[in-house]
């Protein structure tokens, strides 16, 4: 049974009978994990192994693990800095910032791969305009060139540990204050204005070989009346056509307020898939997930299957024991441990 176009979450730290039933559904292609799904490294490794054993080919296991305030697993994992801290280093020492971004990506991916996670939804390619309530220090910088350089370095670090990268939130979520988790953000700029700044990191990262992309639940009314994640203009004309992106497009969570306009969960998924998404995420709403699996009719095309396969983590990652004996890994952890730590604080390694 090939992978389906839906990514779901699960209830807790181990699979329930209901989880297993849902994850075996042919529409499902992956699982996204949250903090509630983690209690220890041993538990996480058992959980990811159990998820992978459910299906052939194995389901994809994903997580939001960017660094800073968006790091789902903390205990026994290296503390990863907010990406804005790398941007601050860039202002004084660009070469050092690029190196540290690579090391952060390597540590992030090496630890997750050792625990059985296939990929993280990172890096954030949004610009740090200083006004978005949801992006803030998750962004690298205000300068799109700096974002592209640092994101490229982080992606190379991910790749060195066997992990693909997912850029977000196309075509840019940093300009508006509203948080699409709770309301529908509207960005009134023209396409020319967005292209001049916000699109630059996305365009450059596509050129660098970015494997995955997540569009924003944001409306850009001077371009299209629909949010980017539901817009054929943004996904097919701009992202696929003008920018030449050939990787996997993941919707943002369809349970967010920014997706509510599209109707019930099935209608939201249908509209996102028709617009050009390869996979849709539905999180933190078990009843909606049941409805989606019961009523959605969608066959993932062959090209979509290929795109999903590219998201799978490289086989046979280093074990945690082997990682901690690896001088390159130990050195990388030491280098990033103090990033963003203020006077009087202790680094959490």
UniProtKB/Swiss-Prot annotation:
It catalyses: Hydrolysis of terminal non-reducing N-acetyl-D-hexosamine residues in N-acetyl-beta-D-hexosaminides. The active site is at 181 (proton donor/acceptor), 252 (nucleophile). The record marks 179 as: Important for catalytic activity. GO terms for molecular function: beta-N-acetylhexosaminidase activity. Substrate binds at residues 64, 72, 138, 168-169. It holds the Pfam family Glyco_hydro_3. Belongs to the glycosyl hydrolase 3 family. NagZ subfamily. This is Beta-hexosaminidase. It comes from Nitrosospira multiformis (strain ATCC 25196 / NCIMB 11849 / C 71). The lineage of its organism: Bacteria, Pseudomonadati, Pseudomonadota, Betaproteobacteria, Nitrosomonadales.
């Amino acid at each position: 049974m090939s992978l389906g176009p839906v990514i779901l979450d699960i209830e807790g730290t181990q699979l329930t009978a209901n989880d297993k039933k849902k994850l075996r559904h042919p529409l499902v292609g992956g699982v996204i994990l949250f903090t509630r799904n983690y209690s220890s490294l041993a538990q996480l490794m058992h959980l990811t192994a159990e998820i992978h054993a459910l299906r052939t080919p194995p389901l994809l296991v994903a997580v939001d693990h960017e660094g800073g305030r968006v790091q789902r697993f903390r205990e026994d994992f290296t503390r990863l800095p907010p990406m804005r801290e790398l941007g601050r280093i860039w202002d004084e020492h660009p070469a050092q910032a690029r190196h540290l971004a690579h090391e952060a990506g390597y540590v992030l991916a090496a630890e997750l791969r050792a625990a059985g996670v296939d990929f993280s939804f990172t890096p954030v390619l949004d610009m740090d305009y200083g006004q978005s309530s949801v992006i803030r220090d998750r962004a690298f910088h205000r300068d799109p060139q700096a974002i592209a350089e640092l994101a490229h370095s982080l992606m190379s670090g991910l790749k060195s540990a066997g992990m693909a990268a997912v850029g977000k939130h196309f075509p840019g979520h940093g300009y508006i204050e509203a948080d699409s988790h709770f309301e529908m953000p509207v960005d009134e700029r023209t396409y020319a204005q967005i292209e001049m700044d916000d699109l630059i990191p996305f365009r450059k990262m596509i050129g660098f070989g970015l494997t995955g992309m997540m569009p924003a639940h944001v409306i850009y009314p001077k371009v299209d009346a629909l949010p980017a994640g539901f817009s054929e203009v943004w996904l097919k004309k701009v992202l696929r056509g003008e920018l030449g992106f050939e990787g996997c497009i993941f919707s943002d969570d369809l349970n967010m307020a920014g997706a509510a306009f599209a109707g019930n969960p099935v209608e939201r998924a249908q509209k996102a898939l028709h617009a050009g998404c390869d996979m849709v995420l539905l999180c933190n709403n078990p009843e909606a997930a049941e409805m989606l699996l019961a009523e959605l009719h969608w066959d993932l095309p062959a090209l979509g299957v290929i795109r999903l396969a590219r998201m799978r983590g490289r086989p046979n990652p280093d074990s945690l024991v082997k990682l901690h004996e690896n001088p390159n890994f130990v050195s990388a952890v030491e280098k990033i441990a103090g990033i963003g730590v203020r006077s009087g604080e202790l680094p959490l390694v």
